[in-house]
Amino acid sequence: MRSLRGITALGAVVVGTVAIEAVYAVRRKLPLLDEFDASGSIGPPDGIPLLMVILGDSSCTGPGVAEPSEIWFRLVSARLAERGYRVTIRSFAVGGAKSSTALETQVPAAEALNPDLTFIAVGTNDVIHQVPLTTLEKNLDEIIRRMTRVSKLVLVAGVGDLGTVPRLLPPLRQLATRRGRRGDVVQARAAQRHGAIKADLWGAAAEAFRTDPSIFSADLFHPAAPGHQVWADAAWSALEPHLTRE
């Protein structure tokens, strides 16, 4: 009985500590950063036309960067331009969006365009706000299914190691890592089911986020330009092998 009481007491302490850290992470005074609509065009005027659509959250609106050209998918589009593509970008991303938001408001607008390339970067807010992973997977299934029907190629960004976020402190950081990993597994399954490609945010990308303090912006949550470069590298590694097939 004594050991059981001890375990119960320890559990209460852990839960209480996590709750305190969560409140601290949300309420501490940090700067609010500008966001961008990174729609636009890049590449030679006589290049191969390529329409890219973006479904996403703040990872695609760029709080933490100085200008839209530093956002990860704009960096990818610059590499496509170097390959001779004339890239037209239509971003439907909204900061704070969950998978349900993307499904309800972003997908209908995007699928009407019949894009050549679709980037899907939602799910992190689902993970952060404790949306059941079954719900996340169901929403992603529908998002990816609908976009693969109209888009020649679909890339799913996934969820990275949220435990690297400086705003979080232990033990919340460890919990964020575990839940982020589970969320990414859900994204990988959904991508595979529908023939989409998936970026790897848990290899070199996660290591960079863990070790490079310049990755994060002043709000200690969103990545700065170096973080977007890491994301662009991960997306390009997944995308580049498929370019000659399109």
Where are these regions (language model features)?
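Alpha-helical cap/lid subdomain in secreted, periplasmic
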Residues: 104-245
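N-terminal start-of-chain detector that recognizes signal peptides
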Residues: 22-28, 63, 90-92, 128, ...
